[in-house]
Amino acid sequence: MDTRKKSLIEIHLAVFLFGVSGLFGKLLTLPSIIIVLGRVIFSSIFLLFLLLYMKKDIKLKEKKHYFYLIIMGVVLAIHWTTFFQAIQVSTVAIGLLAFSTFPVFVTFLEPYIAKEHIKISNIVLAIITFLGVVLVIPSFEIGNSATQGVLYGLVSGFTYAILSILNKKYVKEYSSAVIAFYEQFIAVIILIPFYFLQKPVFQINDILLLALLGVVFTGISHMLFIKGLKNIKAQTASIISSLEPVYGIIFAAFLLSEIPSIREVLGGLVILSAVFYSTIKSR
Protein backbone atom coordinates (compact mmCIF):
# COMPACT_ATOMS: atom_id res chain seq x y z
CA MET A 1 0.00 0.00 0.00
CA ASP A 2 1.43 3.39 -0.99
CA THR A 3 1.84 6.16 1.58
CA ARG A 4 -1.00 8.32 0.20
CA LYS A 5 -3.57 5.51 0.45
CA LYS A 6 -2.38 4.72 3.95
CA SER A 7 -2.75 8.38 4.91
CA LEU A 8 -6.27 8.48 3.44
CA ILE A 9 -7.27 5.47 5.56
CA GLU A 10 -5.78 7.13 8.65
CA ILE A 11 -7.74 10.34 8.01
CA HIS A 12 -11.00 8.43 7.38
CA LEU A 13 -10.62 6.35 10.56
CA ALA A 14 -9.76 9.44 12.61
CA VAL A 15 -12.81 11.32 11.29
CA PHE A 16 -15.06 8.37 12.15
CA LEU A 17 -13.72 8.36 15.72
CA PHE A 18 -14.08 12.18 15.91
CA GLY A 19 -17.72 11.94 14.82
CA VAL A 20 -18.67 9.26 17.33
CA SER A 21 -16.79 11.07 20.15
CA GLY A 22 -19.52 13.71 20.20
CA LEU A 23 -21.88 11.18 21.78
CA PHE A 24 -19.80 11.25 24.97
CA GLY A 25 -21.20 14.73 25.58
CA LYS A 26 -24.56 13.05 26.18
CA LEU A 27 -23.34 9.77 27.70
CA LEU A 28 -21.44 11.65 30.41
CA THR A 29 -23.37 13.90 32.82
CA LEU A 30 -20.26 15.86 33.82
CA PRO A 31 -19.72 19.53 32.85
CA SER A 32 -18.16 19.92 29.40
CA ILE A 33 -14.92 21.38 30.73
CA ILE A 34 -14.49 18.42 33.11
CA ILE A 35 -15.17 15.97 30.26
CA VAL A 36 -12.38 17.62 28.28
CA LEU A 37 -10.06 17.55 31.31
CA GLY A 38 -10.65 13.81 31.77
CA ARG A 39 -10.22 13.31 28.03
CA VAL A 40 -6.82 15.01 27.83
CA ILE A 41 -5.53 13.42 31.05
CA PHE A 42 -6.11 9.90 29.72
CA SER A 43 -4.98 10.75 26.20
CA SER A 44 -1.75 12.49 27.27
CA ILE A 45 -0.84 9.57 29.58
CA PHE A 46 -1.50 7.13 26.74
CA LEU A 47 0.60 9.18 24.31
CA LEU A 48 3.46 9.55 26.81
CA PHE A 49 3.67 5.77 27.32
CA LEU A 50 3.47 5.28 23.55
CA LEU A 51 6.32 7.72 22.95
CA LEU A 52 8.46 6.09 25.65
CA TYR A 53 7.74 2.63 24.21
CA MET A 54 8.68 3.82 20.71
CA LYS A 55 11.76 5.55 22.17
CA LYS A 56 10.81 8.81 20.50
CA ASP A 57 12.63 12.01 21.41
CA ILE A 58 10.04 14.46 22.73
CA LYS A 59 12.48 17.35 22.98
CA LEU A 60 11.60 20.14 20.54
CA LYS A 61 14.16 21.51 18.08
CA GLU A 62 13.71 25.20 18.86
CA LYS A 63 12.57 27.19 21.90
CA LYS A 64 9.96 29.05 19.86
CA HIS A 65 8.30 25.72 19.05
CA TYR A 66 7.42 25.32 22.75
CA PHE A 67 5.63 28.66 22.62
CA TYR A 68 3.60 27.70 19.55
CA LEU A 69 2.69 24.29 20.97
CA ILE A 70 1.50 25.97 24.16
CA ILE A 71 -0.76 28.16 22.01
CA MET A 72 -1.98 25.05 20.20
CA GLY A 73 -2.76 23.36 23.53
CA VAL A 74 -4.80 26.36 24.67
CA VAL A 75 -6.69 26.43 21.36
CA LEU A 76 -7.34 22.68 21.65
CA ALA A 77 -8.78 23.12 25.16
CA ILE A 78 -11.14 25.87 23.94
CA HIS A 79 -12.12 23.84 20.87
CA TRP A 80 -13.08 20.69 22.78
CA THR A 81 -14.80 22.53 25.63
CA THR A 82 -17.03 24.52 23.28
CA PHE A 83 -17.63 21.38 21.19
CA PHE A 84 -19.02 19.39 24.13
CA GLN A 85 -20.85 22.42 25.49
CA ALA A 86 -22.62 22.78 22.12
CA ILE A 87 -23.77 19.16 22.28
CA GLN A 88 -24.80 19.32 25.94
CA VAL A 89 -26.97 22.43 25.61
CA SER A 90 -28.58 21.27 22.35
CA THR A 91 -28.19 18.00 20.42
CA VAL A 92 -25.40 15.98 18.83
CA ALA A 93 -26.69 16.99 15.37
CA ILE A 94 -26.71 20.74 16.08
CA GLY A 95 -23.29 20.69 17.75
CA LEU A 96 -21.69 18.70 14.94
CA LEU A 97 -23.30 20.70 12.12
CA ALA A 98 -22.24 24.04 13.61
CA PHE A 99 -18.72 22.72 14.19
CA SER A 100 -18.54 21.37 10.61
CA THR A 101 -18.30 24.96 9.32
CA PHE A 102 -14.58 24.90 10.19
CA PRO A 103 -13.33 24.38 6.59
CA VAL A 104 -15.00 27.68 5.65
CA PHE A 105 -13.02 29.37 8.43
CA VAL A 106 -9.88 27.70 7.02
CA THR A 107 -10.52 29.23 3.58
CA PHE A 108 -10.55 32.69 5.21
CA LEU A 109 -7.67 32.16 7.64
CA GLU A 110 -5.18 30.58 5.22
CA PRO A 111 -5.14 33.56 2.80
CA TYR A 112 -4.77 35.91 5.78
CA ILE A 113 -1.77 33.96 7.09
CA ALA A 114 -0.28 33.68 3.59
CA LYS A 115 -1.00 37.42 3.06
CA GLU A 116 -3.18 36.77 0.03
CA HIS A 117 -6.44 38.42 -1.03
CA ILE A 118 -9.67 36.68 -0.02
CA LYS A 119 -11.57 35.56 -3.11
CA ILE A 120 -15.13 36.75 -3.75
CA SER A 121 -16.18 33.11 -4.21
CA ASN A 122 -15.07 32.37 -0.64
CA ILE A 123 -17.26 35.21 0.64
CA VAL A 124 -20.23 33.80 -1.30
CA LEU A 125 -19.60 30.33 0.17
CA ALA A 126 -19.42 31.82 3.66
CA ILE A 127 -22.82 33.49 3.11
CA ILE A 128 -24.32 30.18 1.90
CA THR A 129 -22.87 28.40 4.93
CA PHE A 130 -24.31 31.09 7.19
CA LEU A 131 -27.74 30.56 5.60
CA GLY A 132 -27.41 26.85 6.39
CA VAL A 133 -26.63 27.72 10.01
CA VAL A 134 -29.69 30.00 10.09
CA LEU A 135 -31.86 27.07 8.95
CA VAL A 136 -30.56 24.96 11.85
CA ILE A 137 -31.51 27.66 14.39
CA PRO A 138 -35.21 27.34 15.35
CA SER A 139 -35.21 30.62 17.28
CA PHE A 140 -32.94 33.66 17.31
CA GLU A 141 -33.29 34.18 21.05
CA ILE A 142 -30.00 33.79 22.90
CA GLY A 143 -31.85 31.94 25.65
CA ASN A 144 -32.85 29.19 23.22
CA SER A 145 -30.80 26.03 23.78
CA ALA A 146 -30.45 25.27 20.06
CA THR A 147 -29.19 28.80 19.38
CA GLN A 148 -26.65 28.44 22.18
CA GLY A 149 -25.58 25.11 20.72
CA VAL A 150 -24.98 26.69 17.31
CA LEU A 151 -22.95 29.56 18.81
CA TYR A 152 -20.76 27.20 20.84
CA GLY A 153 -20.40 24.99 17.76
CA LEU A 154 -19.25 27.92 15.63
CA VAL A 155 -16.59 28.85 18.21
CA SER A 156 -15.51 25.20 18.22
CA GLY A 157 -15.27 25.25 14.41
CA PHE A 158 -13.28 28.49 14.37
CA THR A 159 -10.75 27.27 16.94
CA TYR A 160 -10.42 23.94 15.14
CA ALA A 161 -9.64 25.80 11.90
CA ILE A 162 -6.79 27.59 13.68
CA LEU A 163 -5.55 24.29 15.10
CA SER A 164 -5.64 22.57 11.69
CA ILE A 165 -3.47 25.27 10.13
CA LEU A 166 -0.96 25.16 13.00
CA ASN A 167 -0.86 21.34 12.95
CA LYS A 168 -0.10 21.40 9.23
CA LYS A 169 2.84 23.72 9.94
CA TYR A 170 4.48 21.46 12.53
CA VAL A 171 3.61 17.99 11.21
CA LYS A 172 6.66 18.25 8.92
CA GLU A 173 8.90 18.92 11.92
CA TYR A 174 7.69 16.35 14.45
CA SER A 175 5.84 13.04 14.64
CA SER A 176 2.06 13.13 15.07
CA ALA A 177 2.35 11.52 18.52
CA VAL A 178 4.74 14.23 19.76
CA ILE A 179 2.49 17.06 18.55
CA ALA A 180 -0.63 15.41 19.99
CA PHE A 181 1.11 14.79 23.33
CA TYR A 182 2.24 18.39 23.74
CA GLU A 183 -1.15 19.80 22.75
CA GLN A 184 -3.04 17.58 25.15
CA PHE A 185 -0.56 17.87 28.02
CA ILE A 186 -0.79 21.67 27.78
CA ALA A 187 -4.60 21.33 27.77
CA VAL A 188 -4.35 19.35 31.05
CA ILE A 189 -2.36 22.18 32.67
CA ILE A 190 -4.82 24.80 31.39
CA LEU A 191 -7.92 22.90 32.56
CA ILE A 192 -6.78 21.37 35.88
CA PRO A 193 -7.77 24.49 37.93
CA PHE A 194 -11.40 23.97 36.84
CA TYR A 195 -11.42 20.60 38.62
CA PHE A 196 -10.81 22.35 41.95
CA LEU A 197 -13.32 25.08 41.12
CA GLN A 198 -16.16 22.72 40.15
CA LYS A 199 -15.24 19.72 42.36
CA PRO A 200 -17.11 17.13 40.26
CA VAL A 201 -18.12 13.74 41.66
CA PHE A 202 -17.03 10.83 39.46
CA GLN A 203 -18.77 7.48 39.20
CA ILE A 204 -16.95 4.33 38.02
CA ASN A 205 -18.89 4.51 34.76
CA ASP A 206 -17.68 8.10 34.22
CA ILE A 207 -14.04 7.10 34.65
CA LEU A 208 -14.38 4.17 32.23
CA LEU A 209 -16.06 6.35 29.60
CA LEU A 210 -13.44 9.08 30.02
CA ALA A 211 -10.67 6.49 29.63
CA LEU A 212 -12.29 5.20 26.43
CA LEU A 213 -12.77 8.76 25.17
CA GLY A 214 -9.21 9.71 26.06
CA VAL A 215 -7.33 6.70 24.70
CA VAL A 216 -9.30 5.53 21.64
CA PHE A 217 -11.36 8.56 20.60
CA THR A 218 -8.66 11.13 21.40
CA GLY A 219 -5.11 9.77 21.67
CA ILE A 220 -5.35 7.31 18.79
CA SER A 221 -7.71 9.38 16.60
CA HIS A 222 -5.76 12.63 17.04
CA MET A 223 -2.50 10.87 16.23
CA LEU A 224 -4.00 9.22 13.13
CA PHE A 225 -5.34 12.53 11.82
CA ILE A 226 -2.09 14.45 12.31
CA LYS A 227 -0.09 11.55 10.84
CA GLY A 228 -2.38 11.46 7.80
CA LEU A 229 -1.71 15.16 7.13
CA LYS A 230 1.89 14.30 6.18
CA ASN A 231 0.84 13.00 2.77
CA ILE A 232 -2.63 14.52 2.39
CA LYS A 233 -3.46 18.15 1.61
CA ALA A 234 -5.30 20.09 4.32
CA GLN A 235 -8.16 20.68 1.85
CA THR A 236 -8.49 16.94 1.18
CA ALA A 237 -8.53 16.25 4.91
CA SER A 238 -11.25 18.91 5.24
CA ILE A 239 -13.38 17.14 2.61
CA ILE A 240 -13.10 13.85 4.50
CA SER A 241 -13.85 15.70 7.75
CA SER A 242 -17.21 16.68 6.26
CA LEU A 243 -18.28 13.11 7.07
CA GLU A 244 -17.79 13.71 10.82
CA PRO A 245 -21.31 15.09 11.50
CA VAL A 246 -22.79 12.34 9.31
CA TYR A 247 -21.20 9.63 11.47
CA GLY A 248 -22.16 11.42 14.68
CA ILE A 249 -25.78 12.06 13.68
CA ILE A 250 -26.32 8.45 12.53
CA PHE A 251 -24.92 6.99 15.76
CA ALA A 252 -26.84 9.55 17.89
CA ALA A 253 -30.06 8.49 16.15
CA PHE A 254 -29.45 4.81 16.89
CA LEU A 255 -27.89 5.04 20.36
CA LEU A 256 -29.51 8.17 21.82
CA SER A 257 -32.75 8.31 19.80
CA GLU A 258 -31.88 11.87 18.72
CA ILE A 259 -33.65 12.26 15.39
CA PRO A 260 -32.75 15.55 13.63
CA SER A 261 -35.63 17.82 12.59
CA ILE A 262 -36.38 18.70 8.95
CA ARG A 263 -34.83 22.16 9.50
CA GLU A 264 -31.64 20.57 10.86
CA VAL A 265 -31.46 18.15 7.91
CA LEU A 266 -31.96 20.96 5.36
CA GLY A 267 -29.53 23.27 7.13
CA GLY A 268 -27.03 20.44 7.40
CA LEU A 269 -27.26 19.72 3.67
CA VAL A 270 -26.64 23.40 2.86
CA ILE A 271 -23.68 23.62 5.26
CA LEU A 272 -22.06 20.37 4.14
CA SER A 273 -22.60 21.17 0.45
CA ALA A 274 -20.93 24.58 0.85
CA VAL A 275 -18.08 23.08 2.87
CA PHE A 276 -17.58 20.27 0.35
CA TYR A 277 -17.54 22.68 -2.59
CA SER A 278 -15.16 25.11 -0.89
CA THR A 279 -12.64 22.37 -0.16
CA ILE A 280 -12.93 20.88 -3.67
CA LYS A 281 -12.49 24.34 -5.22
CA SER A 282 -9.42 25.15 -3.16
CA ARG A 283 -7.49 22.04 -4.17
Regions inferred by a protein language model and the residue ranges of each:
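Transmembrane alpha-helices of multi-pass small-molecule transport proteins
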Residues: 30-78, 103-106, 159-166, 181-198, ...
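Hydrophobic/aromatic residues within transmembrane alpha-helices
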Residues: 28, 35, 86, 98, ...
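Hydrophobic transmembrane alpha-helices of multi-pass small-molecule transport proteins
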Residues: 47, 51, 70, 118-138, ...
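Specific transmembrane alpha-helical segments of multi-pass solute transporters/efflux pumps
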Residues: 48, 54-93, 99, 135, ...
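C-terminal transmembrane-helix exit sites in multi-pass transporters
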Residues: 51, 102-127, 246-265
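Glycine-/small-residue-enriched transmembrane alpha-helix faces in small-molecule transporters
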Residues: 1-37, 74, 82, 143-169
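Small-residue-rich packing faces within the transmembrane alpha-helices of Major Facilitator Superfamily
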Residues: 19, 44-45, 130, 185-189, ...
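Helix-helix packing/entry segments at the starts of transmembrane helices
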Residues: 95-101, 167-187, 218-254
